[in-house]
Amino acid sequence: MTIFDNYEVWFVIGSQHLYGPETLRQVTQHAEHVVNALNTEAKLPCKLVLKPLGTTPDEITAICRDANYDDRCAGLVVWLHTFSPAKMWINGLTMLNKPLLQFHTQFNAALPWDSIDMDFMNLNQTAHGGREFGFIGARMRQQHAVVTGHWQDKQAHERIGSWMRQAVSKQDTRHLKVCRFGDNMREVAVTDGDKVAAQIKFGFSVNTWAVGDLVQVVNSISDGDVNALVDEYESCYTMTPATQIHGEKRQNVLEAARIELGMKRFLEQGGFHAFTTTFEDLHGLKQLPGLAVQRLMQQGYGFAGEGDWKTAALLRIMKVMSTGLQGGTSFMEDYTYHFEKGNDLVLGSHMLEVCPSIAVEEKPILDVQHLGIGGKDDPARLIFNTQTGPAIVASLIDLGDRYRLLVNCIDTVKTPHSLPKLPVANALWKAQPDLPTASEAWILAGGAHHTVFSHALNLNDMCQFAEMHDIEITVIDNDTRLPAFKDALRWNEVYYGFRR
C-alpha cells in the first residue's frame, strides 16, 4: 500500500442537453469505457472515479463543491466530449480548490472516412469543446494542466500519471506538519524564512519542539527494542569491526538505534512527516542523529539539517511525488568542487544525513567515526556512493514577496577514485551546462546550499510542481546561458512585482 491508495481522481465529462438523450447515453458509455481502460491499462498511480455527466451549471457546481469537501479526492480530470458551453463552468471553477487537468482527447483515434456524418461530428467535439473550456480557464486566470492525446496513447498515460503524482502531493502537503528540533543554525540566512507565508502558500505547518522533549522519548525506549533494531542493522548493512559485537564503538550503535526509535515515536505521535535538527541544539542527546535521520528519510520522511524547514518540507513533497518510481530522493548539499578542464565536478554530501534510497551499494557500510562539529559522542552513519545517471537538485527559497524554486539538471557520475578517509555518504556529479555557468546562475538566483537531490524525478515534474503551487521556477540546464538567465531574473522581478 502506498500514499496513492488513500486518494482518487475524479473523471468529469462535460456536455449539454442540446444533443438529446441518445447522444448523452453514448457519451456516458464512452466515458465508462475510457475510465475502465485507463484504470486497468495505463499504470496510473491513482484510481480514476467516473462522476455523473456535467450538463448544467448546477450539476457542474455540485461536482466541484463535492470535490472540495471530499478528502479522498486529489483532483479533477475533465474531458469535454461534446461542446460544453463554458459559462456553465464558471461557478464551479470559481469555488474549486483541487488541482484540475483537462484531458483533450476523443473516443475514436481515426476518423471513419467513409461513414462520418453530422451525428458523429456532434458526438465527438473535443477539438472545439476543449477550446471553449480553455478560454474560460484563461479568462478566469485559473491555472490548470492540459494533456492532449488519444486515451490509449502511452505518452498521454505517462503525463496524466505524472500530474496525478503532483495532485496527490499537493493534498498531502496541506496536511504536512514539519517538526523542528531546536532552531536554525545561528546567523544562517537562507534556512530562515516566513513560516506563516509558507503555510498560506503551500499548506504545511512548521513548529519547534525543544530537544529536551525528544530526549524524554528517546530515554523511554526499552533495551529490548534497541537490540531488535540493531539486529536489523546487522542484516541490512555491512558493519565495520568497530561497530560489531565487542567492537569499540558498539555502544555508539546502540545509542544511535535508541535515537532512531525515539525520533520515530515522537514523529508518529505528533503526526509529523518532516523534521529538522541542528548540531547547535543537541542538549541531552549523546550524538548528532545521523543513522536515524538516514533511515527515516528512506521511510519517506522529509529532513534537512540546521533547522532548514523549507528543504525538509520540499524533500517530503518530492518523496511523495516519487513514490513507486525508480531511483531515490535525498537531502543533499553542494560540498566541494573538483576543478579540471572539461571535467569539473561537484561532490555533494552532508555531515551525515544522506538518504540510502540513492545508494548504489546493496548493503551500505555502517560505521562510527569522529565528528568534530556538535561536541558530542562519535555518531553512527551509513556510508555509500550514489547511483549514476541523470538527476536534479532543487532548492526552495523565500524571497520575501514570493517563493522561488531553483532546479539544476545534473549528471551523476562514478567516483573515479576511492575515498578511504571520507566517512560520509556522497554523490558526485557534473552540473549542466557546466560548473561555472551552473554555479554562477545558482548564486545569482539566490539558491540555497541545501538541496533535494533526486534520480526519480525530472525537470518536468518540478515545473508541474511550480505551476500547481503558483510559484516562480528558475531552471539551470544545458540550454542555460548567463545573459539570458540574468534577463529572466529581471523580468520575473517585474512580473511578480505587478502581482503583489
From Swiss-Prot:
Coiled coil: none annotated. The keyword Metal-binding applies. Disulfide bonds: none annotated. Pfam families: AraA_central, AraA_N, Arabinose_Iso_C. Mn(2+) binds at residues 306, 333, 350, 450. One of its GO terms (cellular component) is cytosol. Its EC number is 5.3.1.4. Its cofactor is Mn(2+). It is an enzyme of class 5 (isomerase). Gene3D superfamilies: 3.40.50.10940. Keywords: Arabinose catabolism, Carbohydrate metabolism, Isomerase, Manganese, Metal-binding. Pathway: Carbohydrate degradation; L-arabinose degradation via L-ribulose; D-xylulose 5-phosphate from L-arabinose (bacterial route): step 1/3. One of its GO terms (biological process) is L-arabinose catabolic process to xylulose 5-phosphate. It catalyses: beta-L-arabinopyranose = L-ribulose. Binds 1 Mn(2+) ion per subunit. Catalyzes the conversion of L-arabinose to L-ribulose. Belongs to the arabinose isomerase family. Homohexamer. This is L-arabinose isomerase. The gene is araA.
